[in-house]
From Swiss-Prot:
Gene Ontology biological process terms in this record: cell division; cell wall organization; peptidoglycan biosynthetic process; regulation of cell shape
Family recorded in the similarity comment: Belongs to the glycosyltransferase 4 family. MraY subfamily.
Protein name (Swiss-Prot/TrEMBL): Phospho-N-acetylmuramoyl-pentapeptide-transferase
UniProt keyword Transmembrane present: yes
Record's bilayer topology term: Multi-pass membrane protein
Pfam families: Glycos_transf_4 (PF00953), MraY_sig1 (PF10555)
Catalytic activity: UDP-N-acetyl-alpha-D-muramoyl-L-alanyl-gamma-D-glutamyl-L-lysyl-D-alanyl-D-alanine + di-trans,octa-cis-undecaprenyl phosphate = Mur2Ac(oyl-L-Ala-gamma-D-Glu-L-Lys-D-Ala-D-Ala)-di-trans,octa-cis-undecaprenyl diphosphate + UMP
Taxonomic path: Bacteria, Bacillati, Bacillota, Bacilli, Lactobacillales
Enzyme Commission number(s) from the entry: 2.7.8.13
Membrane-traversing stretches: 5-25, 56-76, 83-103, 119-139, 149-169, 178-198, 203-223, 228-250, 304-324
Compartments it resides in: Cell membrane
């Protein structure tokens, strides 16, 4: 298994590392880059220094992760239809984000994919994945923390998994926005689930997760502050869906509330901010999502990244330790 993990890491890294400079050069040469319309971002932070930075970098680690997974499966003669879950999850939500990015980058529509059409597309993708899960793999029981497994009827199961995919793909999208932040957090989450997969003898899941880790390591080289490329919605939404399929594949979806705690808190801060301001015209946080509050307070992106990565590392280590024990 160690050699398979190393192969997944290395192949994912090499493919992404080779592809990213090509994408940066292609988008830059065409002038198809993200440009801030003013010196101040919507969060009240000066981001004019990011003008001219290409986006859509998520395409590289999505494809490199999947290619690496398939290559390792072929090399080690691993045959499993379960790969369908990971491919459909990663590609479908990545495609939705890619459409959003393309509208912004190539057609210069600031809002990209409008909210309602985007939500409908997410629901359709989540429904497709859920139907496959319910029909092929996942048992009709749901494990709750500190409670026995409860039976799930099809409709309840369908709604739960649908909400899970849509929710986590958007949660990852909220966290993206500071150079390197989501890439580092996601890398640790996928590494954690990969280690758990070893304990649970889920070889395919292990290969997929470490293919993602290798691809993200390569992407991080180009995305760390000051970023040479942004992942865009295609990357963030695919990562969120990938986290969700990991938790569901282990038949412990609630585990993602721990491993994805930063994502959950970030999303909660946005919901609280919007609701309280709507009804009482008061802002609970200086800015939401939370990372931008630190940014407005004058923290550098490296300092914010270091704080969030350290917290995520602790969360991941505790989660893996508790699971293994």
């Amino acid at each position: 298994m160690i050699f398979q993990i190393f192969s997944a890491l290395l192949i994912g890294f090499l493919i992404a590392f080779a592809a990213i400079p090509f994408l940066i050069g292609y988008l830059t040469s065409r002038g198809e880059v993200g440009v801030e319309r003013s010196g101040k971002h919507g969060f009240g932070v000066d981001t004019s220094g990011k003008n001219g930075t290409p986006s859509m970098g998520g395409v590289t680690f999505i494809l490199s992760s999947l290619f690496a997974t398939l290559i390792v499966m072929f090399l080690f003669r691993l045959d499993s239809l379960n790969i369908i879950f990971f491919i459909v999850s990663f590609l479908s939500f990545g495609l939705i984000g890619l459409i959003d990015d393309a509208l912004k980058v190539f057609y210069h529509r600031d809002e990209g994919f409008r909210f309602i059409p985007k939500l409908i597309a997410q629901i359709i993708s989540a429904a497709l994945i859920t139907i496959i899960l319910v029909a092929v793999h996942i048992p009709d029981k749901l494990t709750f923390p500190f409670f026995r497994a409860l039976p799930l009827y099809f409709l309840v199961q369908f709604i739960f998994y649908l909400v899970w995919f849509v929710g986590w793909s958007n949660a990852a999208n909220f966290v993206d926005g500071i150079d390197g932040l989501l890439a580092g957090i996601a890398l640790l989450i996928f590494a954690g689930y990969g280690i758990i997969g070893i304990k649970e003898n889920q070889n395919l899941m292990v290969i997929f997760d470490f293919s993602v880790v290798g691809s993200l390591l390569a992407y991080f080289i180009f995305n760390r502050p000051k970023a040479k490329i942004f992942m865009g919605d295609c990357g963030s939404m695919a990562l969120g869906a990938g986290m969700a399929i990991n938790a569901i594949f282990l038949q412990h979806p609630w585990s993602l509330l721990w491993f994805g705690l930063i994502l959950a808190l970030d999303t909660t801060s946005v919901m609280i901010q919007v609701l309280v301001y709507h009804f009482f015209h008061v802002r609970v946080f200086p800015v939401a999502p939370l990372q931008h509050s630190f940014q407005r307070a004058g923290w550098s992106e490296w300092k914010i990244d270091s704080l969030f990565w350290t917290i995520q590392l602790i969360i991941t280590m505790i989660g893996v330790f508790v699971w293994i024990k």
